[in-house]
Amino acid sequence: MPSTEYSILANKLTKRFGDFTAVDEITFDVLPGEIFGFLGANGAGKSTAIRMLTGLLKPTSGYAEVAGYDVRKETELIKRNIGYMSQKFSLYDYLSVEENIFLYGRIYGLSRRIIQSRMERLLEELNFYDQRKLRVGSLPLGWKQKLAFSVAIFHRPKIVFLDEPTGGVDPVARRRFWELIYNAAAEGITVFVTTHYMDCLLYTSPSPRD
């Protein structure tokens, strides 16, 4: 049975590519429902760390658990329990808003009935109902950002990983995006967000440790 004390646990997690060390013995833990900010400059290894934690890249050394599962041995179980949003938002520009939602719902193994029910609610929450037939490529960047995050948690994962999610958007869109993150955390989803913006750490909440 997986441990439930921490959503994410890393101990001296390291990744080397030949003589180059991309991630050097990082150690941290993340509690359930926490919004955890992972700060670092561009090229500091944040994306590499996420790839190890999501089971896409095997660590060179060290240990990590995600949702109670070993990142070396239980990658498929990890993938079933997480959501992921990349820097480029992971959306298909040539598909419509509702087609993107439906596609990811099916990828996550949801039934058509559940997808349709959740989609209707999501479109209303995002005020996207009138835009549901529009191609994603035609949407403003801030709208794409909100949609990409909503798609990443559409299957209601235990943890969602966000890799530089606020890059390239204006301060107003960034603030609105963080409101979505707060709502997800309030529903019990653990949020792991990488950023190189120091001010973004002001949005992260240490409340689960208080």
Predicted regions and their residues:
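Conserved small/polar residues in nucleotide/adenosyl-binding loops
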Residues: 203-210
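A short, proline-enriched helix->beta-strand linker immediately N-terminal to the Walker B motif
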Residues: 154-158
